[in-house]
């Protein structure tokens, strides 16, 4: 890990969403230098599952060697922001560094995102970052250090990053646009940069929302804290950059990233917005049996100041550096995938006259080509899947799940099916359930069969647009766990 140098001794660091997760990790790293930390977050009462409040964070910061000032701040409330800034200046004499970490997330498409969720994401992510920066800038300009760091991604305009969660992407990119604008506006006075993880980051909320074992696919929050510390050490001329945690730490001389991993050697989950070919990333994750970081964390609306890559689901170091898992150039450069039309046209056959005079069976694709072509389920595959599911049900499964699922399947052998895990012993069948479904899942029949047989991860299907979910996401997650138990039979 990156050692502390004492560079931040006496500096005042204002961090939003610092009661837990990434925000608190950055605070503790700075505290080891003897920095003053303003904990600007909402949580004042203990949460039954998400540990940490502004007061418990303050105790940890003091124990690490820093001086803490806990402030109740909802970044949607300009008055609370200004009040916290005033208290910080009154107690510490100024502000040297601002970290815009608080964020809200909902991985839902346009029609499934209620206006209140859109407003929340825009107000917390973009507006909150803008207002907090605006309030701190007069004091940052007076500082010899003068840094603003936003936890936001590079501006990758590939439409595939917008398609499934347009509102979230716009809101998150708003934070990144603040970096673009303010870096130029205050060039020479304040350094303004963005930091984003290459992989999923593990926090307490990840365990709650991602299920057992998800932490093995993540890195610790320490990698973000070390990367942020590296940025703070740099001069004001280092500005307008969109930094990936792993890259800047390599510049610091870090070669072995094992210390940041939760599980050494386990495949890691790449984060959003980094790959120019998202479909290739999805294939890579699925091929390595990885469940995306976005997972359930990002399927639910929560503040990243609480989730901040605690699950979501938001954000991701490793014990063994596996660049091949993160970059997988071979997935992006397979000409077979990009040139399928040649396989369909087969020009070499059209140029042979004897084919027209003496018809013969069509040449079969080679095994590799066959694996690249879409496979249709055989007749009755859906019905057979439900039969096996039915045989796997028990009162114990029903008690553990307590949900009714409806499947809207398109294509061959499609239609409406249901899985009732509320009734005694459980029920399955064709048509709509007798009771209203808690979760409705829409997808193609072949993808449905792959999903229940373990060949397609539900989260992967959701991220790639193959699966659409309406209803209770937490219950959808329970179904994924049930699928895992049944995969061997399917």
Curated annotation (Swiss-Prot):
Keyword NADP: yes or no?
yes
Q: Which residues form the active site?
A: 168 (proton acceptor)
The protein's matches in SUPFAM superfamilies, at most eight in alphabetical order, are given as: NAD(P)-binding Rossmann-fold domains (SSF51735), SCP-like (SSF55718)
Q: What class of enzyme is it?
A: oxidoreductase
Cellular location(s): Peroxisome; Mitochondrion
* UniProt cross-references to InterPro entries, sorted A to Z: HSDL2 (IPR051935), NAD(P)-bd_dom_sf (IPR036291), SCP2_sterol-bd_dom (IPR003033), SCP2_sterol-bd_dom_sf (IPR036527), SDR_fam (IPR002347)
N6-(2-hydroxyisobutyryl)lysine PTM positions read: 42
The UniProt record describes its induction as: Up-regulated by cholesterol-rich food. Induced by fasting.
Tissue distribution is:
Widely expressed.
Q: Which residues carry this modification: N6-acetyllysine?
A: 116
Entry EC no(s): 1.-.-.-
The residues covered by the SCP2 domain are: 380-487
**One GO process term, biological-process aspect:** cholesterol homeostasis
Q: Does the keyword Nucleotide-binding apply?
A: no
Annotated Basic and acidic residues bias: 282-301
GO MF annotations in UniProt: oxidoreductase activity
Q: Which UniProt keywords apply?
A: Acetylation, Hydroxylation, Mitochondrion, NADP, Oxidoreductase, Peroxisome
User: What are the N6-succinyllysine sites (modified residues) in this protein?
Assistant: 390
- Annotated residues that bind NADP(+) are located at 17-23, 42, 74, 172
A GO cellular component annotation here is:
peroxisome
Q: Show the ranges annotated as biased composition (Low complexity).
A: 302-367
> Region Disordered: start and end of each range?
282-370
Q: What does this protein do?
A: Has apparently no steroid dehydrogenase activity. Controls bile acid (BA) and lipid metabolism in response to nutritional cues.
Looking up PANTHER family in the UniProt record yields: HYDROXYSTEROID DEHYDROGENASE-LIKE PROTEIN 2 (PTHR42808:SF3)
Say which family it is in.
Belongs to the short-chain dehydrogenases/reductases (SDR) family.
For this entry, the protein name equals: Hydroxysteroid dehydrogenase-like protein 2
This chain's source organism reads Mus musculus
Gene name in the database record: Hsdl2
